[in-house]
Amino acid sequence: MNEKIAILSAYSFVNIEEPANLIPKLLLIGKRKYVRGTILLANEGFNGSFSGSYENVNLVLEELIKLTGPKDVNVKINYSDVHPFQKLKVRLKKEIVAMNVDGLNVDLFKGEYIEPKDWDEFITKQDVIVIDTRNDYEVEVGTFKSAVNPNTKTFKQFPAWVQQNQELLKGKKIAMVCTGGIRCEKSTSLLKSIGYDEVYHLKGGILQYLEDTQNKNNLWQGECFVFDDRRAVTDDLSPVERHWLQR
């Protein structure tokens, strides 16, 4: 019986002084361990998704952690019968998730995590507003019942939406949500930087929430758009084939 291919996704906001220096080291260990995928490096941290044997993807992650020294890393592992990636790429970027706002230090300045098991109770409180930080085509596929849709085409439009909707956010506990956690984590840093104190985000994002809770209280409506060959998943994480992939 063939071993399943492990697909490891990981990100962390951590200050990396010279990210370009890490590229040859990560390419070397990745290729030696027959790992494929993409790792993005920036001064603000790393964001990667790569596939191989369970042992080897974890060895690459260990090297990434050793080289960058993060306090915490958000990690998720799935399995496949085949490699979803053709080769290993390690790329230098200005940001690991592009918001186009200078001066944010997400590592030091971000909102509080809400665990998936506590999310439903938290977002049904009267003084909480839920903001879905994903792009509009993702929100149209599915979102939380009470979530506000900023109707953005790209994440770079989100800061302008925040500036234009300060009355909506005033006096509220702000709960941010996104697919896997990275975008909503950076969003909390933006809001904290402009003076909002009570800012929160769903740990692990929508996918972790659906996995952990099975949407038992039916607060999630629709499906969750994902950027892989599944296109979208239902609330039990089963693939839905009718949604076409957008990047």
From Swiss-Prot:
Family note: Belongs to the TrhO family.
Active site residues per record: 178
InterPro entries (alphabetical): Rhodanese-like_dom (IPR001763), Rhodanese-like_dom_sf (IPR036873), TrhO (IPR020936), TRHO_N (IPR040503)
Molecular function GO labels: oxidoreductase activity, acting on paired donors, with incorporation or reduction of molecular oxygen
Pfam families linked: Rhodanese, UPF0176_N
Matching Gene3D superfamilies: 3.30.70.100, Rhodanese-like domain
Job of this protein: Catalyzes oxygen-dependent 5-hydroxyuridine (ho5U) modification at position 34 in tRNAs.
Segments forming domain Rhodanese: 124-218
Keywords on record: Oxidoreductase, tRNA processing
Protein name, as recorded: tRNA uridine(34) hydroxylase
SMART domains: RHOD (SM00450)
Top-rank EC class of the record's enzyme: oxidoreductase
Protein EC: 1.14.-.-
Organism listed in the record: Rickettsia africae (strain ESF-5)
Reactions catalysed according to its record: uridine(34) in tRNA + AH2 + O2 = 5-hydroxyuridine(34) in tRNA + A + H2O
Domain of life according to the entry: Bacteria
